Amino acid sequence: PIHVPQEYFDRFPVDKLLLPAGILNDLDDTYLKSADPSDGSGDDKGYRYYKLLEESYGSSEPGIKAFLRAYLAGVAAVDDCIGTVIDAVEENGLADNTIIIVTSDHGWDMGQKGYLFKNTLWEDSARIPMIIRAPGISQAGQRTQQPVSLIDIYPTLIDLCNLQGDTRKNAQGAPLDGFSMRPLLADPSSGNWDGPEGALTMRFAGPKNNH
């Protein structure tokens, strides 16, 4: 959410927050150490946001802590909203035939590498939450080590709902990409997975971000 009630901020006193190890001044493996300020090569949005945060708070640490506090407040608010949805599903007798998926379209770099945005290939940005409750199939609290992608959600829903049909838009088109995660939901450790061993993520390239 863009706006979060103060009560969620109050759950995370800024003086109690600890930054992850190595979050500050960790630029050795980035292009910034050799960027030329005169050619705008360091003017990526994520770096620009980080610099603005530094300027607003006087230094990196208090700025990142304030940002982290707001991020945690947002996560807590969403968590409560998800709980409200689950309660409604259960109270209305829909728990046995309702699939619930909690995910996101991207992660977020929280100041690592001097970057404060999305759209990077670093894990903090490329990795997302993926929680699926499929009645009669998934088991609570189980995890899989198999990487999956957002493009696997639609094939999974088709499979779980026993839907039939052609996923091509027209005769000239190709079937939708992605693979059903049903085997992983049924037994996360089975290794029964038709998809690739890795997950695909992309980062656009251009004159200012071809690094």
Labelled PLM ranges:
Residues 1-147, 160-173:
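Active-site-proximal cap/lid insertion segments
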Residues 106-112, 151-154, 159-211:
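C-terminal cap/loop subdomain of S1 sulfatases and analogous C-terminal strand-loop tails that border
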